[in-house]
Amino acid sequence: MSTKIDETITFECETGNYHTFCPISCVSWLYQKIEDSFFLVVGTKTCGYFLQNALGVMIFAEPRYAMAELEEGDISAHLNDYEELKTLCIRIRKDRDPSVIIWIGTCTTEIIKMDLEGMAPKLEYEIGVPILVARANGLDYAFTQGEDTVLAVMAHRCPEQEFPIGESKETKTKTKLFPFPLLKEKKLVEYANHPPLVIFGSLPSNLVSQLDTELRRQFIKVSGWLPAQRYADLPSLGDGVYVCGVNPFLSRTATTLIRRKKCELIVAPFPIGPDGTRAWIERICPVFGIEAQSLEEREERIWESLKDYLDLVRGKSVFFMGDNLLEISLARFLIRCGMIVYEIGIPYMDKRYQAAELALLKDTCIRMCIPIPRIVEKPDNSNQIRRMRELQPDLAITGMAHANPLGARGIGTKWSVEFTFAQIHGFANARDVLELVTRPLRRNENLDNLDRTTLVRNNNEFYTSTPTPR
């Protein structure tokens, strides 16, 4: 007997609040990605405590970020903000000599209306170091959108595309330095003659190399990445340049690239999981008139290598509470692995930027013959917990605040922040995603095998108890 599956995606919006990790945490991975940068977070002691605890980096390690702590004098306007920030930036230039200083605005600077954008142009002219201002406050932005605001601001500083299509800056430079044929050039890949392609999104260097290699196999050359490892290496942007994102939380950056820099956006699913990576490449290739090759076989090999994990997750259920805006991509991948997704909570949803990802989610659900999960934007945690009590999922992917309470109620949990910091992009890293997902499932199965599944408190001490046979 065949059953008809609803093929429409249901969107809902609840309270309008952001129950997420603080967006200033983007400093933790961006300062490592942009090697010659320095991040100055302008906020209160609370922001400082958060960075100290969340990043786990001690001050004496001299990381390339710092706190400009606001005091009562700053808030009551008794102190000159410009002079205070100037003193700090001069000290940063002297001690660390960065190529760029990035000010990160917080909730406090937003509330007291501190004019960081007005001060930065004058100050960067005085000290001779570029200063970018990114508002990453938790009032307006969710967890990973902190990176989005930084990249959107950085896109404004990218140079204009100067070289004719088909002739790169690297080619012209090599011709000037070596006016004779290079023997090594014979070993290089013959790239197709296509317009410049810039990929935006912060990924570790090894992931950048992996995705570059995947596109190189299709004879596509990546002209640059935003952000680059060094500020001076920011890619050239302009009319005729194609851009494509690797993360679903970069809608503001995409809008800036389209409207301000006149780039052409390639709307594609995101390269998370073998299915997403294949779809990402298949969306890029036709834009340049190239037919994708050998992707189906490559994807099948990856799925075959994941068989041990797939046997463990098949038929298990998962509930996304919403935190890092990776929820749609992760849900699509887990559905393809055979899991059942009850609900996808997400802090913010840009349907235009994630259109291709949503289409792939729908196609995946139809292929796996399961209902399309409903998507709840800005979910109310109380309502979610009520729904979880009814559904009893095997796993909840949630923020840190809810992990222990849910675990105490017998629901396996995984911190969503772990997916943010893990390497989950590309063909080769699908195993890492499943390792994160299956860890709590394996732990619960081991407890079941021991018949020790509950905690009992006696005289202020906890003991594991064996359920009474019925």
Swiss-Prot record:
<keyword id="KW-0602">Photosynthesis</keyword>
<feature type="binding site">
    <location>
        <position position="107"/>
    </location>
    <ligand>
        <name>[4Fe-4S] cluster</name>
    </ligand>
</feature>
<dbReference type="GO" id="GO:0016636">
    <property type="term" value="F:oxidoreductase activity, acting on the CH-CH group of donors, iron-sulfur protein as acceptor"/>
</dbReference>
<dbReference type="Pfam" id="PF00148">
    <property type="entry name" value="Oxidored_nitro"/>
</dbReference>
<keyword id="KW-0149">Chlorophyll biosynthesis</keyword>
<protein>
    <recommendedName>
        <fullName>Light-independent protochlorophyllide reductase subunit N</fullName>
        <ecNumber>1.3.7.7</ecNumber>
    </recommendedName>
</protein>
<keyword id="KW-0067">ATP-binding</keyword>
<keyword id="KW-0479">Metal-binding</keyword>
<feature type="binding site">
    <location>
        <position position="22"/>
    </location>
    <ligand>
        <name>[4Fe-4S] cluster</name>
    </ligand>
</feature>
<dbReference type="InterPro" id="IPR000510">
    <property type="entry name" value="Nase/OxRdtase_comp1"/>
</dbReference>
<comment type="function">
    <text>Component of the dark-operative protochlorophyllide reductase (DPOR) that uses Mg-ATP and reduced ferredoxin to reduce ring D of protochlorophyllide (Pchlide) to form chlorophyllide a (Chlide). This reaction is light-independent. The NB-protein (ChlN-ChlB) is the catalytic component of the complex.</text>
</comment>
<comment type="similarity">
    <text>Belongs to the BchN/ChlN family.</text>
</comment>
<dbReference type="GO" id="GO:0046872">
    <property type="term" value="F:metal ion binding"/>
</dbReference>
<keyword id="KW-0934">Plastid</keyword>
<dbReference type="InterPro" id="IPR050293">
    <property type="entry name" value="LIPOR_BchN/ChlN"/>
</dbReference>
<dbReference type="GO" id="GO:0005524">
    <property type="term" value="F:ATP binding"/>
</dbReference>
<dbReference type="GO" id="GO:0009507">
    <property type="term" value="C:chloroplast"/>
</dbReference>
<comment type="subunit">
    <text>Protochlorophyllide reductase is composed of three subunits; ChlL, ChlN and ChlB. Forms a heterotetramer of two ChlB and two ChlN subunits.</text>
</comment>
<keyword id="KW-0004">4Fe-4S</keyword>
<keyword id="KW-0408">Iron</keyword>
<feature type="binding site">
    <location>
        <position position="47"/>
    </location>
    <ligand>
        <name>[4Fe-4S] cluster</name>
    </ligand>
</feature>
<keyword id="KW-0547">Nucleotide-binding</keyword>
<dbReference type="GO" id="GO:0036068">
    <property type="term" value="P:light-independent chlorophyll biosynthetic process"/>
</dbReference>
<dbReference type="GO" id="GO:0016730">
    <property type="term" value="F:oxidoreductase activity, acting on iron-sulfur proteins as donors"/>
</dbReference>
<dbReference type="InterPro" id="IPR005970">
    <property type="entry name" value="Protochl_reductN"/>
</dbReference>
<comment type="pathway">
    <text>Porphyrin-containing compound metabolism; chlorophyll biosynthesis (light-independent).</text>
</comment>
<keyword id="KW-0411">Iron-sulfur</keyword>
<keyword id="KW-0150">Chloroplast</keyword>
<dbReference type="GO" id="GO:0019685">
    <property type="term" value="P:photosynthesis, dark reaction"/>
</dbReference>
<keyword id="KW-0560">Oxidoreductase</keyword>
<dbReference type="GO" id="GO:0051539">
    <property type="term" value="F:4 iron, 4 sulfur cluster binding"/>
</dbReference>
